Amino acid sequence: MSLFGTTSGFGTSGTSMFGSTTTDNHNPMKDIEVTSSPDDSIGCLSFSPPTLPGNFLIAGSWANDVRCWEVQDSGQTIPKAQQMHTGPVLDVCWSDDGSKVFTASCDKTAKMWDLNSNQAIQIAQHDAPVKTIHWIKAPNYSCVMTGSWDKTLKFWDTRSSNPMMVLQLPERCYCADVIYPMAVVATAERGLIVYQLENQPSEFRRIESPLKHQHRCVAIFKDKQNKPTGFALGSIEGRVAIHYINPPNPAKDNFTFKCHRSNGTNTSAPQDIYAVNGIAFHPVHGTLATVGSDGRFSFWDKDARTKLKTSEQLDQPISACCFNHNGNIFAYASSYDWSKGHEFYNPQKKNYIFLRNAAEELKPRNKK
């Protein structure tokens, strides 16, 4: 299928400029709605790399599809193409040149989608759903890394049907991130492993989790020299850990903070605690965004250890987020995240992807 979303009405009125849409409880921040959003929960978002002119957004959903939009400078979105898996799509990523998109699915496969030809081919196979997918571009090799609930991490040359390497994980892969030459994988039972990717991928260190509850999302951050130096890890218990790989003072430099919590509705539960569904670092400022089951996004300055902004509450969870390559656009998905089980799923409820102008709100506190 080469195109989707041919309806002309949704998302085209009043969305020509950032922040000019009308507001209600599904969009209290008055952000731009992406046209023709997926028909089921949105599990992952990814913007195109800087090598591609313009901005293109990819979303994977529980409707088994992957969609691509062009995001114009005005903020308006144009549906471009769509591909299908035979199970929910759990993760997506881009090749460094922007010509390919890689997709991971509950159907136990990963695919490579050539955007120029609009053809998708299977490039990976696991014995259980594939939870994470990342493109690795090293000086001496390039490959796709897939993490699965079959407790393996596999590395694939896209020209071969067999993995170039298989690494065993202590448990099911729940989340991962890659910024060369570093990868981090968080697993079930609070497993946490850092890999180095130079020459060939290898395990660098196993880390005792700084969080007491199930890992949900992880994102690597860079130092002032633009090198990966640590990661932020989010859990189902409304908490994020900031962890440096080789900090000068571990007890002082590594810390956790509470987020995505609200005052409880009764005295026996003084606080409602929600899952952190996504973490994304601003590519210019190094500040970060978190999104949660509480239906809010928050912006943070980890160096000043302060909150920069919290959104109004949406009428359903925020399930995923990402920044575009220059940090001007913050994309976030509003859809059910299954954190309360299937009985709270309402198939009549629409799913949304919103775009927000992020240029000013994520500047660190000490920079005016």
Swiss-Prot record:
Top-rank lineage group of the source organism: Eukaryota
Keyword Transport set for record: yes
Main subcellular localisation: cytoplasm
GO biological process: cell division; regulation of mitotic spindle organization; RNA export from nucleus; transcription-dependent tethering of RNA polymerase II gene DNA at nuclear periphery
Subunit organization: Interacts with NUMA1 (via N-terminal end of the coiled-coil domain); this interaction promotes spindle formation in mitosis. Interacts with NUP98. Interacts with MYCBP2. Interacts with USP11.
Keywords: Cell cycle, Cell division, Cytoplasm, Cytoskeleton, Mitosis, Nucleus, Phosphoprotein, Repeat, Transport, WD repeat
Native source organism of the sequence: Sus scrofa
WD repeats: 37-79, 84-114, 125-157, 168-206, 215-255, 271-301, 310-346
Matches recorded under InterPro entries: G-protein_beta_WD-40_rep, WD40/YVTN_repeat-like_dom_sf, WD40_repeat_CS, WD40_repeat_dom_sf, WD40_rpt
Presence of the UniProt keyword Transferase in the record: no
PANTHER family: MRNA EXPORT FACTOR AND BUB3
Biological role stated in the UniProt entry: Plays a role in mitotic bipolar spindle formation. Binds mRNA. May function in nucleocytoplasmic transport and in directly or indirectly attaching cytoplasmic mRNPs to the cytoskeleton.
PROSITE patterns named in the record: WD_REPEATS_1, WD_REPEATS_2, WD_REPEATS_REGION
Name used for this protein in its record: mRNA export factor
Family under the similarity heading: Belongs to the WD repeat rae1 family.
Cell compartment(s), UniProt: Cytoplasm; Nucleus; Cytoplasm, Cytoskeleton, Spindle pole
List of residues that carry Phosphothreonine: T229
Recorded GO MF terms: RNA binding; ubiquitin binding
GO CC list: cytoplasm; fibrillar center; mitotic spindle pole; nuclear pore; nucleoplasm
Region (Disordered): 15-34
Transmembrane region(s): none
